Curated annotation (Swiss-Prot):
<keyword id="KW-1133">Transmembrane helix</keyword>
<keyword id="KW-0472">Membrane</keyword>
<dbReference type="GO" id="GO:0150103">
    <property type="term" value="P:reactive gliosis"/>
</dbReference>
<feature type="binding site">
    <location>
        <position position="500"/>
    </location>
    <ligand>
        <name>Mn(2+)</name>
    </ligand>
</feature>
<feature type="domain" description="GG-type lectin">
    <location>
        <begin position="97"/>
        <end position="258"/>
    </location>
</feature>
<feature type="modified residue" description="Phosphoserine">
    <location>
        <position position="7"/>
    </location>
</feature>
<feature type="region of interest" description="Disordered">
    <location>
        <begin position="634"/>
        <end position="660"/>
    </location>
</feature>
<keyword id="KW-0328">Glycosyltransferase</keyword>
<dbReference type="Pfam" id="PF15711">
    <property type="entry name" value="ILEI"/>
</dbReference>
<dbReference type="GO" id="GO:0000139">
    <property type="term" value="C:Golgi membrane"/>
</dbReference>
<dbReference type="InterPro" id="IPR052463">
    <property type="entry name" value="O-linked_mannose_GnT"/>
</dbReference>
<comment type="function">
    <text>Participates in O-mannosyl glycosylation by catalyzing the addition of N-acetylglucosamine to O-linked mannose on glycoproteins. Catalyzes the synthesis of the GlcNAc(beta1-2)Man(alpha1-)O-Ser/Thr moiety on alpha-dystroglycan and other O-mannosylated proteins, providing the necessary basis for the addition of further carbohydrate moieties. Is specific for alpha linked terminal mannose.</text>
</comment>
<keyword id="KW-0812">Transmembrane</keyword>
<dbReference type="GO" id="GO:0007420">
    <property type="term" value="P:brain development"/>
</dbReference>
<dbReference type="GO" id="GO:0010467">
    <property type="term" value="P:gene expression"/>
</dbReference>
<keyword id="KW-0464">Manganese</keyword>
<dbReference type="InterPro" id="IPR029044">
    <property type="entry name" value="Nucleotide-diphossugar_trans"/>
</dbReference>
Length: 660
């Protein structure tokens, strides 16, 4: 290393000197000052632009005021001022206002917009099929009614005809089809659409799309139609845009006398549509009823809970029949509405009744179940002294002697602990199987559809263990379970005092109603005196059943029970048939017999200890299950019980529908 010499080409190494702290801070401060100057310059420019813009606005405003002073207009009220703010198209030579209406029809979606506001939009899957109808007030343009009629299903076209016939003349009608609306659109409905001026509606075909706007009793304002090219496809979507001229308020109002009843009527009829003569200008139907008082009315102070949802037209029909029943106490009626819907409350207010709304809890059948629980709890809170409550649904017609029926039988609930309820509905009481309005039965099932509930039963047993919101159970099926019923029975009439008219609901459609509800017999005779009411008590009823069986004529069991000739062509006789029933839950033969008798066959209803009572050809007809029923002892030794083989079950067949 001693002989090493540095290269003369390389610069000698020297340690780098650090920049002094003074120079470092001077550099930083110089950069910050430059940034500050830039920001200040930008702010000055922004303020300058703002000042220029404001000066221009002030000058424009002064110029406009000066021009207005040179050509002054007369003073205008508020409505006229609003008119001046409308678009130039609406300020034409005609003083009437005009609505912009858009209507859309397609396979999967419908919508209606009025002046840019969407008043209907339905694109939910597997819902909203059929013809959607909207009614607008011809003077204000506000929506008075929205309905959808699933005219793919039976009888929905009848409901649509009824609704459209009840709409007042002059109203604006809007129709649009989602998915399919022609399958059950019968001639009567087509004729009505033709009378409204529609050309495409009466010719509506399978899966066609259609949009229509017109005035009832007036001109058609727009219509579009697209025909389906094949059975497997739909018509093209159609979008109808049209103008709807509005009429004066004078043309849209009725001039009734200024009374408290008519003030209620006026409020109602200015908001909603589809209620027919209640809003007639010339001869409106009454909204106050004066049925005859019921002598010795045992249910005068029993609260009545009407369970309702968003079916206001059903509620209107139901309340009319309820308020027309002899012995009704309007002050004891409370309508419980599941949700904050306006129109059902409007119906309640029309009749001057009490209405209570509450927030829905859960979904589907659990929501209905929670609504019942909330309503029953509220009923007994409103009337803490009440021992009973009458429970009704919004889709029931109420018989004229409904309260008379309850008044004559309600003491049984107090005196007989073996009873679960009193119901106005007979599950097997069809037009061809019910005959005697004075006759009562004991049955092991809880029919519902107009029934009396004992407060002690609800507060001590049912309320504490009512199904919770997460359980998607039907409340009535739960109440029929052995754990709740505990061997108790219900009293029912042979001829029902309620009629289930609703065809739209959670577990209801047109097909189901046609098969199981439409042909139920409904009492229309006032003042029926029930016969031998005390014989419905537990021990007395057994005596009555044994008496009937002892007097009954045994039918020829070699004949087919499904044939009309199985029962003789007589009247006023009592007959008995014995069917195979190996155990208490063996209902195979009964179910097949119920099918061929065209009565309720989806589960077992209306039985008492393995015995069913009904009428055939105006004869009292008893059916006894052998050997499960204790009444099997009445079977003659020579008689072989009837056995009907159930059909083989198809794989993947859907389960039975349930009544609600």
């Amino acid at each position: 290393m001693d002989d090493w010499k540095p290269s003369p080409l390389i610069k000698p190494f020297g340690a780098r000197k650090k920049r002094s702290w003074y120079l470092t801070w001077k550099y930083k401060l110089t950069n910050q000052r430059a940034l500050r100057r830039f920001c200040q310059t930008g702010a000055v420019l922004f303020l300058l632009v703002t000042v220029i813009v404001n000066i221009k606005l002030i000058l424009d405003t002064r110029r406009a005021i000066s021009e207005a002073n040179e050509d002054p207009e007369p003073e205008q009220d508020y409505d006229e001022a609003l008119g001046r703010l409308e678009s130039p198209r609406r300020r034409g030579s005609s003083p009437r206002r005009v609505l912009d209406v858009e209507v859309y029809s397609s396979r999967s979606k419908v919508y209606v917009a009025v002046d840019g506001t969407t008043v209907l939009e339905d694109e939910a899957r597997e819902q909203g099929r059929g013809i959607h109808v909207i009614v607008l007030n011809q003077a204000t343009g506000h929506v008075m009614a929205k309905r959808v009629f699933d005219t793919y299903s039976p009888h929905e076209d009848e409901a649509m005809v009824l609704f459209l016939n009840m709409v007042a003349p002059g109203r604006v009608l809007i129709c649009t089809v989602k998915d399919e609306g022609s399958f059950h659109l019968k001639d009567t409905a087509k004729a009505l659409l033709r009378s409204l001026g529609s050309q495409a509606g009466p010719a509506l075909g399978w899966r066609d799309t259609w949009a229509f706007v017109g005035r009832k009793g007036g001109p058609v304002l727009g219509e579009k139609h697209s025909k389906s090219p094949a059975l497997s496809s739909w018509g093209d979507p159609v979008l109808l845009k049209t103008d709807v001229p509005l009429s004066s308020a004078e043309e849209a109002e009725c001039h009734w006398a200024d009374t408290e009843l008519n003030r209620r009527r006026r409020r109602f009829c200015s908001k909603v549509e589809g209620y027919g003569s209640v809003c007639s200008c010339k001869d409106p139907t009454p909204i106050e009823f004066s049925p005859d008082p019921l002598p010795d009315n045992k249910v005068l102070n029993v609260p009545v809970a009407v369970i309702a949802g968003n079916r206001p037209n059903y509620l209107y029909r139901m309340l009319r029949s309820l308020l027309s029943a002899q012995g009704v106490s309007p002050q004891m009626i409370t309508v419980f509405i599941d949700g904050y819907y306006e129109e059902p409350m409007d119906v309640v207010a029309l009749f001057g009744l009490r209405g209570i709304q509450h927030t829905p809890i859960s979904i589907k059948n659990a929501r209905v179940s929670q609504h019942y629980k909330a309503s029953l709890t509220a009923t007994f809170n409103l009337f803490p002294e009440a021992k009973f409550a009458v429970v009704l649904e919004e889709d029931l017609d109420i018989a004229v002697d409904f309260f008379s029926f309850l008044s004559q039988s309600i003491h049984l609930l107090e005196e007989d602990d073996s009873l679960y309820c009193i119901s106005a509905w007979n599950d097997q009481g069809y037009e061809h199987t019910a005959e005697d309005p004075a006759l009562l039965y004991r049955v092991e099932t809880m029919p519902g559809l107009g029934w009396v509930l004992r407060k002690s039963l609800y507060k001590e047993e049912l309320e504490p263990k009512w199904p919770t919101p997460e359980k998607l159970w039907d409340w009535d099926m739960w109440m029929r379970m052995p754990e709740q019923r505990r061997g108790r029975e219900c009293i029912i009439p042979d001829v029902s005092r309620s009629y289930h008219f609703g065809i739209v609901g959670l577990n209801m459609n047109g097909y189901f109603h046609e098969a199981y509800f439409k042909k139920h017999k409904f009492n229309t005779v006032p003042g029926v005196q029930l016969r031998n009411v005390d014989s419905l008590k537990k021990e007395a009823y057994e005596v009555e059943i044994h008496r009937l069986l002892s007097e009954a004529e045994v039918l020829d069991h070699s004949k087919d029970p499904c044939e009309d000739s199985f029962l003789p062509d007589t009247e006023g006789h009592t007959y008995v048939a014995f069917i195979r029933m190996e155990t208490d839950d063996d209902f195979a033969t009964w179910t097949q017999l119920a099918k061929c008798l065209h009565i309720w066959d989806l589960d077992v209803r209306g039985n008492h200890r393995g015995l069913w009572r009904l009428f055939r050809k105006k004869n009292h007809f008893l059916v006894v299950g052998v050997p499960a029923s204790p009444y099997s002892v009445k079977k003659p030794p020579s008689v072989t019980p009837i056995f009907l083989e159930p059909p083989p079950k198809e794989e993947g067949a859907p389960g039975a529908a349930e009544q609600t």
